[in-house]
UniProtKB/Swiss-Prot annotation:
It comes from the Eukaryota. The modification N6-succinyllysine is found at K232, K316. One of its GO terms (cellular component) is cytosol. It catalyses: (2S)-ethylmalonyl-CoA + H(+) = butanoyl-CoA + CO2; (S)-methylmalonyl-CoA + H(+) = propanoyl-CoA + CO2; (2R)-ethylmalonyl-CoA + H(+) = butanoyl-CoA + CO2. GO terms for molecular function: carboxy-lyase activity; methyl/ethyl malonyl-CoA decarboxylase activity. Gene3D superfamilies: 2-enoyl-CoA Hydratase, Chain A, domain 1. PANTHER family: ENOYL-COA HYDRATASE-RELATED (PTHR11941), ETHYLMALONYL-COA DECARBOXYLASE (PTHR11941:SF27). Its EC number is 4.1.1.94. Belongs to the enoyl-CoA hydratase/isomerase family. The modification N6-acetyllysine is found at K232. This is Ethylmalonyl-CoA decarboxylase. Keywords: Acetylation, Cytoplasm, Lyase.
Amino acid sequence: MRRCEVNSKPISEYFGIPCENREMAKCLLTSSLSVRTKLLQTGVSLYNTSHGFHEEEVKKILEQFPGGSIDLLKKQNGIGILTLNNPNKMNAFSGVMMLQLLERVIELENWTEGKGLIIHGAKNTFCSGSDLNAVKALSTPESGVALSMFMQNTLTRFMRLPLISVALVQGWAMGGGAELTTACDFRLMTEESVIRFVHKEMGIVPSWGGTSRLVEIIGSRQALKVLSGTLKLDSKEALNIGLTDEVLQPSDETTALEQAQEWLEKFVSGPPQVIRGLKKSVCSARELYIEEALQNERDVLETLWGGPANLEAIAKKGKHTK
């Protein structure tokens, strides 16, 4: 039985199976790409029952662990402020907070006027990971995997939001808090802040998608150092390895948030549909094969070409404005 080729590659490289003809190979490859493209669409869950994931059952367990809140402020300038609010426990995620984070992500997916998002922790601390009360109750491998799938789904949808996102790290970002920073497009740290992946000391590995995202940000070699060494990454070291984008001057909580907004504003200036289109294009370029990413680029362009922002820019000859 001969092997079919798509784009000069044996189809077995994609699926590990031989096929009878070129058309079948193309069909299989197209179906696989279509699935990934659908997952990139706003509002689509990463897992379902076919993966052994029962979301409602996980939610019933998580709602038994109250404490803290995830607060969202949507500003008129198109920048949202997401606050992890559980200061008595260094903003650790309770079960209810995990549920609320998904709710806020869904709300942001439907915020058509949104352009940017800043996530930070209350009282000058970012997040210390998971509340141990919830962790102790989820002691079996099955429950651990279920929680992992829930948070992987939430943070992947967070990462794919059509908003340019920034993690403002003050104080400590540990464990799950460190993983959360990697779901943002950018990271800003105050001078005294520290990011630390403490998972090895807890006898586990990152389980909220943090490993994949960390490798994407700083490369596999540096990621292995950070994870296996449980390194305490202060702002200087995080900047040196490319984990953070800028270090803010010493300031209180309010001033740091103002600085973060000022930093973000230069990236989100312009019409929402253009900023959102740019973010969608970057997401597809990162996660899809080149052919499908190019198709997505054309799809986004079709919604913008000849639109109000495009016509106004042409009228002002904005393309050549310095």
